[in-house]
Design a protein with these regions (language model features):
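Active-site recognition of the HExxH zinc-binding catalytic motif
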Residues: 56-68
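Metalloprotease/metallohydrolase-associated module, dominated by Zn2+-dependent proteases
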Residues: 1-52, 69-106
Length: 106
């Protein structure tokens, strides 16, 4: 498990989480809320977003990282959007499930 708060392990690869207002994405879209750089293993989240939106965007970008590390290089953005929105809601509706799994299932 990564020691630093801004590190996230995905399929054995360590991604760095960076929260900043400006980041250069592959298409330099200034309207992006987040971006997952697979080569550098960095997940960017736009700093000016609300805390709730940052969490939602993090789950979205983590979904991209998970699919990429699982070998899905071409990803359907609509599928990633739908899946990450639902997963974000599951986390909100079940706030203790992750805490439970960390302390009870280990």
């Amino acid at each position: 498990m990564p020691e630093a708060k801004n590190k996230i392990k995905v399929c054995g690869m360590t991604y760095t989480l960076k929260i900043q207002e400006h980041f250069k994405a592959y298409d330099d879209d200034r309207n992006l809320w987040g971006y997952c750089d697979y080569e550098q293993q960095i997940i960017y989240i736009r700093e000016s977003l609300s805390e709730q939106k940052k969490k939602q965007v993090l789950i979205h970008e983590l979904t991209h990282a998970i699919l990429h590390e699982a070998g899905y290089k071409e990803q359907d953005e609509d599928l990633v959007n739908r899946f990450s929105i639902i997963l974000h809601q599951v986390v909100i509706d079940n706030p203790n499930v992750l805490v439970f799994s960390l302390f009870v299932l280990n």
